[in-house]
């Protein structure tokens, strides 16, 4: 029985010695290069993540290309929808351009009519300046101008008579008061 016990006890001693050697070796390796190993592991993890994302995107692109190759009807429908959208947008743009042109034509017509009226009023000897400030009310949908009475100068008496103006010193008698100069009147300090 001693023989059976001897190989068993020798074997664990050998295993513990190899474990101790492994522990010492790994410990000294980590003590010397631990930070380098840690940073290289982190960097390797980041690189693997980036590469996996790119591989997924590449596979997705390949699948999309395969679908478009297999289904040309889908491509044709997309192109037709795109062409229809472009045509609609162009029609809207053309309609806006036509509205703008019509507006410009109306403005030019209005200017031309005002110039003709100004010329006619100059030929008749009237002043043309009074009509230039107000818009033409004949064409507008507003109230009729025949019911509006123009305001003239009223016959009211002014509140203050005599033409006295306290800000300028004009009027109000023979003398005019002026305020004195600022500062000491003697011109210096004591």
Swiss-Prot record:
InterPro entries: Selenoprotein_S. The chain crosses the membrane at residues 28-48. GO terms for cellular component: cytoplasmic microtubule; Derlin-1 retrotranslocation complex; Derlin-1-VIMP complex; low-density lipoprotein particle; very-low-density lipoprotein particle. It is found in: Endoplasmic reticulum membrane; Cytoplasm. Residues 78-90 are annotated as: VCP/p97-interacting motif (VIM). Keywords: Cytoplasm, Endoplasmic reticulum, Membrane, Selenocysteine, Transmembrane, Transmembrane helix, Ubl conjugation. It holds the Pfam family Selenoprotein_S. GO terms for biological process: cell redox homeostasis; cellular response to lipopolysaccharide; cellular response to oxidative stress; endoplasmic reticulum unfolded protein response; ER overload response; negative regulation of acute inflammatory response to antigenic stimulus; negative regulation of endoplasmic reticulum stress-induced intrinsic apoptotic signaling pathway; negative regulation of inflammatory response. Residues 115-190 are annotated as: Disordered. Residues 160-174 have a biased composition (Gly residues). One of its GO terms (molecular function) is antioxidant activity. It is a single-pass membrane protein. It comes from the Eukaryota. Interacts with DERL1 and (via VIM motif) with VCP, suggesting that it forms a membrane complex with DERL1 that serves as a receptor for VCP. Also interacts with DERL2, DERL3 and SELENOK. The SELENOK-SELENOS complex interacts with VCP. Interacts with CCDC47. One of the histocompatibility antigen responsible for chronic graft rejection. Belongs to the selenoprotein S family. This is Selenoprotein S. It comes from Mus musculus (Mouse).
């Amino acid at each position: 029985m001693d023989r059976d016990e001897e190989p068993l006890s020798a074997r664990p001693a050998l295993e513990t010695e190899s474990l101790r050697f492994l522990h010492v070796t790994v410990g000294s390796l980590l003590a010397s290069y631990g930070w380098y190993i840690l940073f290289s592991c982190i960097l390797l993890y980041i690189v693997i993540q980036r590469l996996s994302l790119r591989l997924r995107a590449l596979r997705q692109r390949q699948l999309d290309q395969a679908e478009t190759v297999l289904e040309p009807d889908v491509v044709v429908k997309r192109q037709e929808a795109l062409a229809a959208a472009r045509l609609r947008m162009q029609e809207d743009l053309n309609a806006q351009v036509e509205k703008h042109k019509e507006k410009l034509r109306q403005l030019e017509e209005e200017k031309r009519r005002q110039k003709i009226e100004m010329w006619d009023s100059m030929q008749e000897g009237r002043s043309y300046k009074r009509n230039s400030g107000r818009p033409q009310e004949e064409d507008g949908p507003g109230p009729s101008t025949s019911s509006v009475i123009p305001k003239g100068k009223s016959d009211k008496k002014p509140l203050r008579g005599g033409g006295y103006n306290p800000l300028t010193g004009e009027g109000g008698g023979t003398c005019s008061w002026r305020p004195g100069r600022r500062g000491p009147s003697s011109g210096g300090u004591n």
